Amino acid sequence: MFYGTSKVLQLAGPDAYASSLQQRLLNAFRVLEANRTIMFGDATFLSESKWRVYSSINHEGAEIPDCMASITELMIQTSAFSKRLFEQIESIPEEERLFSPTVAALAHEGTELDRKICNWYDSISLQPDPADPFTQLALAKYHAVRLFHCRNFTYYTCWLPGTIPQLDQMEIDGCVVAIIYLCEKILHSSNIPGAILLFPLRMAGAHYKFEWQRNHVRNLLNQIHKSGFVVAERIQIDLVEFWEFQDDQDSIQLSV
């Protein structure tokens, strides 16, 4: 069903959504598609230039900035960049990466994207009513996107010092704590579907090392699963497998 909707929207093109009802339909789809593509590493037509231009025009025309629409666009851009980052680096022999102009260009582009993400947060912090659940959701996604984007650079050692976006441990911990706090508030005091929280919770869980912390994420995912979103179980299974791998790697490092 979701695939069929995607194809219909794609074939119609961005110019087909002139009415407010059509725009709401497209915006709802964008939120779901952004979550899907960033969690599973898939490509999306929403990252194509004509769809990005459409999104930019609609944001500029709004009387009040839509924080959900703008963070959704950043999720789509970050997901597309992530896919390209891995594809391009893997295509370069390892011994050539350190001095590759492609790698240098990726570092620069990644830094610029990180700046855009941070600028989004700065603009949102100036807006009123941070207690609004959709603002809270947008903030949870911001912290998750920042973790996701910066973590992607840690999988390679081909970067020159100071050329890539990085988070220190205090910043990582701050993002994770914020995600858990915001997701709990959203689940307990709003009607926002829990499935929309899966990406932030997955990113928070991926940065937890202690069992009591991981249980906190499990409990929130169980709440989402019990509310009818069975995909939460899949996310929990993925996290458990990741935690087992992470623990094995930590054990190997300690034994060396």
Protein language model regions, located:
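Acidic/serine-rich, low-complexity amphipathic helices located in mid- to C-terminal regulatory regions
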Residues: 1-87, 256
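Intrinsically disordered, low-complexity regulatory regions with latent secondary structure
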Residues: 220-256
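Amphipathic alpha-helical interaction segments
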Residues: 37-38, 59-60, 128, 237, ...
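Cytosolic regulatory protein-protein interaction regions
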Residues: 45-222, 226
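Generic signature of intrinsically disordered, low-complexity segments enriched in small/polar residues
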Residues: 5, 32, 84, 123-124, ...
